[in-house]
């Protein structure tokens, strides 16, 4: 049984509906091996849970991609001008569908209303938890592919530190990283890169601009790639430009210790809120609790932000196969910010840190 058929089988057995209708492209890739960006056109994977038969509905212009990559039983192309929902409902009728499972977090309102033309709201259910639970667990092959993505990311960052950053703008550094990532085989960037220097580094999700890196700055770089396997990476390092001041040293070391504590707490069976607490307590003790304004981490895989969510309210335990980030931060408006982010694989025998790029303050101080 292929990995895709195995995933379909697990989903079919975990939901209590006749038919699953998936429309999110990454979810469809997860269950078929076929990735299409449909834009405004309808892309859908239809899974008959009674016999696990799969049908992919797609824009006819993507026929070649589907033929080459999709591991599904039936193909249902639609041309511009055709009503894809007519074809969809015919497929549902063929499978004697009485109840439908959808991605409640993705299916747009207009398409949901189309479903209501034929089905009562009481027969439509969200299957997001089941899909997210499956995507949240990775195997050894997934782990190896994620490692390749992280290795490319770290190689580009090493090139940047060798080339030097002083006098370069945030945009110039972001462009440098994009070029290096492409040269090492990245399909695309997974976001950004976020390159923020000086006071801008206090913006957790700021955008790079024309501000140039100067002596005395924090330089925060958060970036990642989409690899050939479509797994993504996500890492953050914060550099200090020139000799650190006492305040910079204090803030950086507080975040570094919180990162270390979060990693040490992240073992299978540990409630996720305890991982958040382990890191957060150290930042609070250092006097910066009010400046750590987000959760400790999130899941990572084919999507940049997947389940699970490592926040202070999540009492679910970490499971073997989870891939998560640990990314504490301190952000002081008018001064600057520090975030350090690693990606981890939760294993049976221990936790694997995908990242090897240095974090010690002496190793992240740049003089050029």
Give the residues covered by each predicted segment:
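Active-site neighborhoods and metal-handling regions in enzymes and metal-associated proteins
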Residues: 1-368
């Amino acid at each position: 049984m292929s990995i895709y058929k195995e995933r379909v089988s697990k989903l079919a057995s975990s939901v209590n509906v006749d038919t699953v209708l998936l429309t999110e492209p990454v979810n469809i890739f997860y269950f078929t091996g076929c990735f299409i960006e449909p834009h405004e056109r309808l892309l859908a994977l239809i899974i008959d849970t009674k016999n696990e038969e799969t049908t992919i509905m797609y824009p006819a212009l993507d026929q070649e991609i589907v033929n080459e990559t999709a591991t599904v039983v039936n193909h249902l192309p639609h041309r511009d001008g055709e009503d894809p929902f007519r074809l969809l409902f015919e497929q549902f009728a063929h499978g004697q569908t009485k109840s439908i499972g959808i991605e409640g977090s993705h299916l747009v309102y207009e398409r949901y209303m189309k479903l209501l033309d034929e089905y009562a709201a009481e027969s439509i259910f969200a299957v997001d938890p089941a899909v997210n639970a499956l995507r949240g667990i990775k195997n050894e092959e997934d782990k190896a592919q994620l490692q390749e993505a992280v290795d490319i990311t770290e190689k580009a960052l090493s090139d940047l530190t060798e080339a030097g950053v002083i006098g370069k703008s945030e945009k110039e550094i972001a462009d440098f990283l994009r070029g290096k990532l492409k040269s090492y085989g990245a399909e695309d960037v997974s976001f950004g890169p976020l390159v923020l220097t000086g006071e801008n580094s206090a913006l957790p999700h700021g955008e790079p601009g024309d501000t140039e890196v100067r002596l005395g700055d924090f330089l925060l770089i958060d970036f990642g790639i989409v690899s050939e396997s479509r797994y993504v990476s996500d890492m953050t390092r914060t550099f200090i430009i020139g000799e650190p001041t006492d305040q910079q040293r204090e803030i950086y070391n507080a975040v570094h210790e919180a990162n270390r504590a979060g990693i040490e707490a992240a073992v299978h069976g540990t409630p996720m809120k305890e991982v958040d607490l382990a890191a957060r307590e150290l930042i609070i003790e250092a006097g910066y609790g009010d400046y750590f304004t987000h959760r400790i981490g999130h899941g990572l895989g084919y999507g940049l932000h997947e389940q699970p969510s490592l926040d202070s309210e999540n009492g679910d335990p970490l499971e073997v196969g989870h891939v998560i980030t640990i990314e504490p931060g301190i952000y002081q408006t008018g001064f600057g910010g520090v975030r350090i982010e690693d990606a981890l694989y939760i294993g049976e025998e221990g936790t694997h840190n995908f990242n090897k790029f240095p974090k010690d303050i002496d190793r992240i101080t740049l003089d050029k």
